[in-house]
Amino acid sequence: MIGKSIKFILIGIIVILAASVVALQLYHRTSSTRTRSDQEYLALLKQVVGIVKKSYVDPVDEKKLVKGAINGMLSSLDPHSVYMPADSFKEMQVSTSGSFGGLGIEITVKDGKLTVISPIEDTPASKAGIRSGDHIALINNVPTRDMNINDAVSRMRGPKDTKVILTILRKGSDKPLVFPLIRDVILVKSLRFRTLEPGYGYLRIMQFQARTGMDLATALETLKKENGGTLQGLILDLRNNPGGLLDQAVSVANHFLGDRRDNSLIVYTRGREESSRHDFMASIGEKEPPYPIVVLINGGSASASEIIAGALQDHGRAVIIGTQSFGKGSVQSIMGLPNNAGLLLTTAKYYTPKGRSIQAKGITPDIVVENLVLNGKTNLESTPFREKDLEHHITDGTKKPVGPEQPEKPLSPAQPLPLAPSQKPDDSIKPIDDIHVPPKTLTDDQVKQDYQLLRAVDLLKGWELLKKAAKNK
């Protein structure tokens, strides 16, 4: 009996060893095939470059050819992965670290056309009436068809008080619209706030920057003091918010999610490399009281702003009102290259707490409300377009990602989530005291003309009335 058992064990060991040898051989064969395939493609590229250099009708610059090959390779992946030569990489660092002269537009490329994702509030572009979805046909009479984003950005940036003429194609307009714009120093404010009516606060976040979380805390305290120490409801306006720093989006959500016992999941990212796998959790501690919250979004709400809307929606902490958001659910990493160049490469996608991919889908409002003028006929969101409309956009995929894991630390370090490589969040933010200037934040006349905002106020009031009605039963 013992002899038979030993015999079976030996046979099992032999089978396992044989399988291991076969698997190892297959691995080396696959690895060898992959290496040989890579070498063949590189040899083909080298051959084509050689033929072009030798036989093209005019002399060619080899450096230009290589850059073109790199740009072609990256543009075939997705709209957000780009190669940045030294000058463009330096421009990006300038826009990340301080003020710069420009127009205040977040841009991308759609079907070869330079397209506005959203104008940034209180910049020359927004003041002139540039809208989300506008196609920029000409910059100073230079056609932009198939123009590289970095080239477009460099043409629109420049010294303060200098002139730029944009020719815009807009859906619904019979002829091109010409916008003479004067460059200004772009100092993007993080947020603004005011009391709309007694008990009801309004807080608009324009972009997630290095101080957004701290500014939000100060704004909430100020609103509560203005309203007798508590709020009956809050409207969080994320319309035309192009995104920004991931850790600040997490910080904002952290004020409203979790409690002294629960560290709720806010968002998680998944990519091919282990370094791209992160779970972002709310910290355990005191949170805002459970007053009702309405979040406003539209087609210009992207990236980090979609994280907030998705997290609050999944946890049932807020009602989302407006139109479908942009659908930018991918994470870009910045990598340095030789000769001071850089690479912006998509390395992960992010997912809401319930595992929803935002990529190319966006956040669907709980209540769809178009942005109409008060006669109810005109939709101010003139050309709604989304991430899914961009050429070579990344799909959301058919498989669900591996679920969230316990994070090493809550509130992980800042990770930029750029919507388009046009400009990154500006860290030079004015103090909160400079931001809270009610006449400049949102006037009463502006409130009366904002149909989506009025619907949000009605919902909060109705919420309170329904609670009172339920108590009286």
Predicted feature locations:
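C-terminal "post-core" interaction segments
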Residues: 5-14, 18-20, 25-28, 39, ...
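Flexible, low-complexity junctional segments that flank or bridge functional domains
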Residues: 1-234, 240-244, 262, 417, ...
